[in-house]
């Protein structure tokens, strides 16, 4: 919580949704019907979660938005940035939001609302993986010159509600191995959060060689493993989703600044 401590020192008193401390960690290497527990002290530091918290990022972002609005920050949910605006000297001037209230042919409806121009001394782009404006900026300013090609993965996630007996609040668990073969990058995360909820996810690199591989089907197969299935039997899946992930690492990281703008987060490639 170092960054949160610096940003909002009294975040605990302000009701931040950061409550479930990591209490136990596991790393399993799975065979088809077996599992090998890997000693956590052998794991790299990025895989160690001592003193970390299990959170819902969506809940934290909503709370941070409330704190920002208290300081006078204006937030425009539902208004996507559609275009980068430039000054005469080529520097970034800001963005324009999308026109709203158009029919499928682009004609104006009664609810038409023209997009807004938002100008700033520095515009920060944080659109996530392969952001459509971020891609334009990387090309426009040649930010990836001399860098390795970027690599991508897909992450599938579910939230489950399980019984008290199956729930181990504070447990962080990762797995590698089955159902993927040795040539395919991927693995899982299983986080036991509050309210008897488990955040379950599976990530597969999109450079897999088998054209018949289905990331979704591999995720479902993973849940049938004896070491995994027992956590969810009798439980209920309450939400699910998927997203693209940046996997290229530091050797693929573009320059993150340009005249009048910054790239941050997965728009630049700084996963974790």
Task: Annotate each PLM feature.
Residues 36-57, 66, 94, 203-205:
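Helix-loop-beta segment of a Rossmann-like dinucleotide-binding subdomain
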Residues 230-241:
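Flexible, glycine/charged-enriched surface loops at secondary-structure junctions
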Residues 58, 62-63, 67-231, 269-270:
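Predominantly flavin-linked oxidoreductase catalytic cores and closely associated redox partners
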Residues 19-21, 179-184, 244-245:
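A short catalytic or substrate-binding loop motif that flags glycine-/basic-rich loops and adjacent residues
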Residues 24, 185-188, 258-260:
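Short glycine-rich loop/turn motifs
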Residues 1-34:
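N-terminal FAD cofactor-binding segment of flavoenzymes
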Residues 13, 104-109, 236, 244-245:
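Domain-scale detector for complete catalytic domains at protein termini or as standalone homologs
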Residues 242-271:
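FAD-binding beta-loop-beta segment adjacent to the flavin cofactor pocket
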């Amino acid at each position: 919580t170092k960054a949160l401590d610096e940003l909002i020192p009294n975040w605990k008193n302000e009701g931040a949704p950061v409550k479930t401390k990591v209490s136990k960690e596991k790393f399993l290497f799975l065979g088809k019907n077996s599992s090998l527990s890997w000693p956590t002290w052998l794991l790299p530091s990025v895989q160690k979660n001592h003193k970390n918290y299990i959170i819902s990022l969506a809940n934290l972002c909503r709370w941070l938005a409330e704190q920002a609005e208290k300081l006078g920050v204006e937030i425009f949910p539902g208004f996507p940035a559609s275009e980068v605006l430039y000054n005469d000297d080529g520097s970034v001037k800001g963005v324009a939001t999308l026109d709203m209230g158009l029919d499928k042919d682009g004609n104006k409806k009664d609810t038409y609302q023209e997009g807004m121009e938002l100008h700033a001394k520095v515009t920060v782009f944080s659109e996530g993986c392969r952001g459509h404006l971020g891609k334009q900026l990387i090309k426009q300013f040649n930010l990836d010159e001399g860098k390795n090609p970027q690599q991508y993965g897909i992450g599938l996630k579910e939230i489950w509600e399980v019984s008290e007996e199956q729930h181990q609040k504070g447990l962080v668990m990762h797995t590698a191995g089955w159902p993927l073969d040795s040539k395919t990058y991927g693995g899982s995360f299983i986080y036991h959060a509050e309210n008897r909820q488990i955040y379950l996810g599976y990530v597969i690199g999109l450079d897999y060689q088998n054209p018949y591989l289905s990331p979704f089907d591999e995720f479902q197969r993973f849940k049938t493993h004896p070491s995994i299935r027992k956590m969810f039997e009798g439980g209920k899946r309450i939400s699910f989703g998927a997203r693209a992930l940046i996997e290229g690492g530091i050797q693929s990281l573009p320059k993150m600044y340009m005249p009048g703008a910054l790239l941050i987060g997965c728009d630049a490639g700084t996963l974790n």
